[in-house]
Design a protein with these regions (language model features):
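N-terminal export/targeting and maturation segments
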Residues: 13-82
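Intrinsically disordered, low-complexity segments enriched in proline/serine/threonine
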Residues: 8, 41, 112-113
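Extracytoplasmic electrostatic interaction patches
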Residues: 83-144
Length: 144
């Protein structure tokens, strides 16, 4: 009987973990925080976020573009993105996030020529970079 209680607690924890991941997916977080929908054909390669009770801190999500998808008219339409160099603040954000999470598929610092789009909302920042050579999007978030 005493063994039953720890087993039930472990099972409850596992259920809460999987239900939480289903409810609070990366895509739902981008929609809730930034109003961005992730189109079909973008495959999440990596995702990192700081553990935080309030959801603040750094996040990094890397998406790979699958063959023959149209991104026209979406947030990820790199034809509408800026090609100018990165600002010092943007480079600092990339360095901070990269140093914190050490992603396997991270972008080179300083990044080679990339397409970029930045959104600022509620004091937070979302920096989206598209690397045409890698055919990947890198989303750097700083939630305050």
């Amino acid at each position: 009987m005493l063994l039953l209680i720890p087993v039930l607690l472990i099972l409850a924890g596992i259920v809460v973990y999987f239900v939480g991941n289903a409810i609070f997916s990366t895509e739902k977080g981008l929609q809730a925080n930034w109003g961005i929908s992730v189109p079909e054909g973008l495959r999440e390669v990596e995702h990192y976020e700081e553990s935080s009770f309030h959801g603040d801190g750094y996040r990094l999500t890397i998406y790979e573009v699958q063959a023959d998808i149209s991104l026209n008219g979406t947030f990820f339409d790199y034809g509408d993105m800026d090609r100018e160099g990165l600002t010092e603040a943007q480079v600092a954000l990339i360095e901070n996030v990269t140093n914190q999470f050490d992603p396997k598929n991270g972008i080179a610092i300083p990044p080679r020529e990339v397409y970029k789009r930045q959104v600022a909302k509620f004091g937070g920042i979302l920096l989206c970079l598209y690397d045409a050579t890698e055919n990947k999007f890198f989303l750097y978030e700083e939630i305050l």
